[in-house]
């Protein structure tokens, strides 16, 4: 009988999309360095022609990439996933399949039938699972459930009655930018995929309500929701905000944008463990966030949080930061960076995943 190679299978919507994909790229890069045997199925939910994926596929030897052609709405995607597994059964034994996007739980029962363990990793606040009996039923087929935030862990444990393990996100060690001599806030960076759940419209309402703000708001992220993007554009045009708003799209290296920014804002309706906050902390930039689960664990000062429908509270957060004396501001920046360096290493994140995936 042929001896089959034992490998791990990771399902990804796209190689580059949002925070979840960023974390799994970190995992993939670490896996390659450690010579872990990993196959990555890129589903191409959004049909993105990704140069970063092509570069990674050419460079890596231990991690292998396979590209599908979408078709989630028609169900064709799930057939393509299972076809890949079946076509490789003679020479590959997928011991574990890692899923992070709830609709991909569709394949969990079939994977179990084929003898593959299934691990689900919750990347937001667990709301999608909580609102869908279908996802809850499929989740029962998973051998392990993971979450990247304490809130999501607690919510999924209450929902499923099962143990949920928390694996914190990882962040590369990066140089800290010096504190700007002029601490005025004129360039606000909003790093997130363009989508209704990221709530970028709130920043546009802030611009409309506070015309005295004479700076610029910069949105950096892939356009996931075209309808929402069009809604934003219409609002911008209607309120003559074009000179104060910039859309960068996907930025492969965000370091320069963080360096230019005076303030980072994350207005999401819900989060797990937000990469944006970790990045802002690591680079030494102030950050304010929506007052929702997930973000409260990282941004513990309530004066740096705002309601998801309240541009007035954004203004209050900005004033709070601007009114800090130099010592208090520097202490805030240093304490934030210390949190990332102590608790959010990529090595710890990747090894924690592998300990479960390799069982």
Where are each of the predicted segments found?
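Acidic anion/phosphate-binding donor-loop and adjacent secondary structure
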Residues: 154-158, 168-186, 196
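N-terminal strand-loop element at the rim of the active site
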Residues: 10-18, 22-74, 157, 225-228
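Short His-centered aromatic/hydrophobic patch
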Residues: 98-105, 122
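Conserved acidic donor-binding segment of nucleotide-sugar-dependent glycosyltransferases
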Residues: 301-312, 320-326
């Amino acid at each position: 009988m042929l001896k089959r190679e034992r490998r791990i299978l990771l399902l990804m919507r796209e190689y580059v999309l949002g925070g979840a994909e960023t974390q799994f790229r970190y995992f993939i890069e670490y896996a390659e360095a450690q010579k872990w045997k990993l196959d990555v199925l890129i589903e191409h939910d959004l049909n993105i022609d990704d140069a970063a994926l092509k570069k990674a596929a050419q460079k890596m030897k231990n991690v292998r990439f396979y590209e599908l052609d979408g078709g989630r709405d028609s169900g064709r995607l799930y057939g393509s996933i299972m076809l890949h597994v079946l076509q490789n059964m003679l020479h590959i034994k997928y011991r574990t399949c890692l899923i992070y996007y709830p609709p991909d739980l569709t394949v969990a029962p079939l994977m179990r039938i084929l003898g593959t363990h299934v691990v689900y990793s919750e990347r937001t606040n667990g709301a999608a699972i909580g609102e869908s009996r279908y996802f809850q039923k499929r989740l029962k087929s998973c051998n392990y459930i993971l979450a990247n935030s304490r809130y999501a862990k607690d919510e999924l444990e209450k929902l499923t009655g099962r143990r949920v393990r928390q694996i914190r996100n990882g962040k590369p060690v990066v140089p800290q930018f010096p504190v700007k001599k002029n601490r005025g806030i004129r360039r606000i960076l909003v790093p997130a995929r363009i989508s209704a759940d990221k709530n970028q419209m709130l920043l546009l309402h802030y611009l409309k309500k506070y015309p005295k703000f004479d700076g610029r708001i910069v949105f950096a992220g892939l356009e996931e929701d075209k309808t929402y993007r069009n809604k934003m554009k219409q609002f911008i045009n209607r309120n003559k905000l074009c000179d104060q708003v910039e859309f960068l799209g996907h930025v492969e290296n965000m370091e320069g944008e963080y360096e230019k920014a005076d303030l980072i804002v994350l207005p999401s309706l819900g989060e797990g463990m937000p990469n944006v906050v970790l990045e802002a902390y690591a680079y030494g930039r102030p950050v304010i966030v929506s007052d929702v689960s997930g973000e409260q664990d990282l941004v513990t000062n309530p004066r740096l949080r705002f309601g998801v429908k309240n541009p007035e509270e954004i203004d209050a957060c900005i004033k709070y930061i601007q009114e800090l004396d130099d010592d208090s501001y520097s202490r805030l920046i240093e304490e934030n960076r210390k949190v990332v360096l102590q608790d959010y290493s990529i090595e710890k994140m990747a090894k924690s995943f592998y300990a479960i995936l390799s069982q």
